């Protein structure tokens, strides 16, 4: 019997991690905000949409990559809280799946890799 690549354990775990890390971040991202930290990239992403440049027109606290990525999400989905949380959820998905793949490349057991990546997605 052929081993179906689509339905092997590793791919199923990656699909589950995708949905789990996306949905948990969407749920808790809409629970509330912490005003000191929550709007740091919101404002800079919006300013990039207005045509301003980081470091030239305003000071950036964490580097321009996240701000430009946030501007892309604002451009595609509109300037609102949902697109802001979707951006955070997208990064959570990328980091969680990357964690799983790196742990698997270190030859860690697939179940341990999945559990650690799931826990990482809750924290990230």
Regions found by a protein language model. Give the residues of each.
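Start-transfer (signal-anchor) and selected internal transmembrane alpha helices
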Residues: 1-24
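Aromatic- and kink-enriched transmembrane "portal" helix at the membrane-lumen/periplasm boundary
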Residues: 81, 95, 117-124
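Transmembrane-helix motifs of polytopic, lipid-linked glycan transferases
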Residues: 86-108, 115
């Amino acid at each position: 019997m052929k081993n179906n690549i689509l339905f092997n354990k590793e791919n199923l775990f990656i699909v589950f991690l995708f949905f789990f890390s996306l949905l948990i971040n969407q749920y808790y991202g809409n629970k509330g905000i912490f005003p000191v930290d929550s709007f740091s990239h919101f404002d800079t992403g919006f300013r990039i949409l207005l045509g301003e440049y980081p470091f030239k027109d305003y000071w950036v606290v964490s580097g321009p990559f996240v701000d430009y990525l946030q501007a892309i999400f604002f451009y595609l989905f509109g300037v609102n809280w949902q697109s802001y949380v979707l951006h955070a959820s997208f990064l959570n998905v990328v980091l969680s799946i990357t964690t799983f793949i790196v742990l698997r490349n270190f030859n860690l057991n697939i179940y341990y890799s999945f559990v650690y990546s799931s826990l990482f997605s809750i924290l990230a």
